Amino acid sequence: MKASVIFSTYNSEEWLEKVIWGFSVQTTKDFEIIIADDGSREATKNLIEKYKTELDIPIIHVWQEDNGFQKSQILNKAILASTTDYLIFTDGDCIPRKDFVETHLNNRESGRFLSGGYFMLPMNISKFISREDVLSQKCFDVNWLTQNGLKKSFKNNKLSAKAFKAKLLNFLTPTKPSWNGHNASS
């Protein structure tokens, strides 16, 4: 096992399932999923148990009693439950592209952390995304997104940029390195 993917959840079964679908089609399977559950109801546990039996990726469910917003505490417990020495953090409502884990693993360096971006979709598009859209990766295609309501914008270029165009856009629109919970690893 090369990495542990850690994300939190709280009574958000619809989003949790979409995220799990995204991890089910990763280009590498050499990782475990650790779901840091900040006191969700039984429905969340049942969904996780279902996918533990359906997927060929280990899923560890770390749960704590609901004592208000205790995300940092449950994330710390999830880190302790990890069986690897490389941790990838994301959010419980961020659907990963199929190369998410592989990209983190390919770019890791000892003594460094990686910080990636994310693209926040309007709620109506997020709710519209189906299992098939995630498994086929259509939900990451700019044309599909605009056909389903995403407004045209210059920032949409980052969604489909490859090779030279991606490097150029990163140069033109740099961001400061920061540790964030939606796309970071160390």
Locations of regions flagged by a protein language model:
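Acidic helix N-cap motif at the loop->helix transition within catalytic regions
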Residues: 17, 42-50, 99
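Short, acidic, metal-binding catalytic loop of nucleotide-sugar glycosyltransferases
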Residues: 21-30
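A conserved acidic beta->alpha catalytic loop
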Residues: 22, 37-46, 68, 94
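Short beta-strand/loop segment that forms part of the nucleotide-sugar
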Residues: 30-39, 60-64
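Glycine-rich, basic loop-to-helix element that forms the pyrophosphate-binding segment
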Residues: 65-82, 99
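Short aromatic/hydrophobic "clamp" motif used to bind/position activated sugar donors
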Residues: 87
